[in-house]
A protein has these predicted regions:
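Flexible, glycine-rich active-site loops centered on histidine and acidic residues
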Residues: 4-21, 78-99
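N-terminal beta1-alpha1-beta2 module of alpha/beta enzyme domains
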Residues: 1-64, 68-72
Length: 99
């Protein structure tokens, strides 16, 4: 089976639960301590029960130092492509390349 030219990575994909935001952050920290490679969250800006994805990724990145952060679902119809690209690029710069 092909390896597609890159290492297999493992990550955590917590639900960005607005009712329990500290739990999401605890899970992200635990993912890093456990040696996982990535923490990724969903982008559903129209759902009141979910935290804003970019804000959440910023806080996760601030509380960790090695895991990469990413969206696992980007809601393109509700995100201007230029603004989305700038958000991703800014977070990548601020995290030292962890996006």
């Amino acid at each position: 089976m092909s390896d597609y030219g890159h290492d297999l990575e493992f990550g955590l994909f917590p639900t960005p639960d607005a009712a329990r935001p500290h739990r999401v952050l605890e899970l992200a920290t635990l993912a890093e301590v456990s040696g996982l490679d990535l923490v990724s969250v969903q982008d559903h800006p129209y759902q009141a029960r979910h935290l804003d994805a970019w804000t959440l990724l910023s806080v996760i990145a601030a509380r960790t130092s090695t895991v990469r952060v990413a969206l696992n679902v980007a809601n393109l119809p509700l995100r201007n492509p230029v603004v989305l690209a700038r958000s991703a690029a800014s977070l990548d710069l601020l995290t030292g390349g962890r996006v």
